[in-house]
Amino acid sequence: PMKLYNLKDHNEQVSFAQAVTQGLGKHQGLFFPHDLPEFSLTEIDEMLQQDFVSRSAKILSAFIGDEIPQGVLQERIGNAFTFPAPVSKVQDDVGCLELFHGPTLAFKDFGGRFMAQMLTHIAGDKPVTILTATSGDTGAAVAHAFYGLPNVKVVILYPRGKISPLQEKLFCTLGGNIETVAIDGDFDACQALVKQAFDDEELKAALGLNSANSINISRLLAQICYYFEAVAQLPQEARNQLVISVPSGNFGDLTAGLLAKSLGLPIKRFIAATNANDTVPRFLQDGNWSPKATQATLSNAMDVSQPNNWPRVEELFRRKTWRLNELGYAAVDDETTKETMRELKAIGYTSEPHAAIAYRALRDQLQAGEYGLFLGTAHPAKFKESVEEILQETLPLPKELADRADLPLLSHNLPADFAALRKLMMG
């Protein structure tokens, strides 16, 4: 069975089920796999010919082992990955791995849906309550991932009036086992309420509380799968010269890509692309870890100055004896992001700020004879207002958003007060 250890205390070892259920270890430490499996070149070639779901089952059972039988795992992955991850041609030597074809039009659908399948499988008949705070994207992905699953209730807190109306419609119109709560306060106030709930042992035990945090190991494992799916779509000559540029905020996507490489997937090198929140690029340049105050940018999902997955990146490099100076990096400011979006539009590809940053870093660093992929982490319509303004054109709403636009909001309004939240949750 799979063993994982806490990066802050290597003595704390847990099973896959424990890591999924707990999320974090003590001292808020991240869990990391004890064994790093590797496939042979022959196995990789065979896997690249499989379909997305069967291949993903093989990848994930290499990590999870017999803790979940491969047949069950494959069925659960089939429930999670119900949409494609196509590589869209942008230029002769560049493609975009589009991760926004799921129900909430963002890459988080992969991790969120697989995590939901794992949590409900592990919990069995025991009731589970997912409690999480969101500033938009994560909430939508979590809500849709758990919607309609048995024995699980989801409570999502968000700052009232501080997320886009479009995003609010995406997850506050579901009902059923999804409770959405608009809090009078900012995102930090929502986070504080979540923390209070997890400190309340009685509430935790009564409801089987779980955070479904983006740091959950099941999300990270799910994200490895789409790197294989990307390579499977490339011609042989591109596979041997592949450079992947990853838009980076919390660095989960980059961690997953590096794990794919560590499994044996042929990736020549990675580029970590950030916005003005450039803690990692500065660190890779001069070796000093010195986060600054977070700056608001166009690519707001990457407005992170202390990326919480970075310890996993460092651990993987240490374990594989890779050198950090082999990692490419770039920080792209808002002005350049806008120019790049217009440049992409001119060659026929409509993009949004996060993908544009990854493309910019890739284009600037791609060498002759190499093939480049950049990750498209969200549908341009998720950033409709800014994309329309920058590109001076109207974006049609994709079906997923249009279908929900006229539905009534089902949210409760609450003050930023734990007693009120507790009453609602116990009710």
Task: Name the predicted role of every residue range.
Residues 1-427:
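PLP-dependent amino-acid enzyme catalytic core
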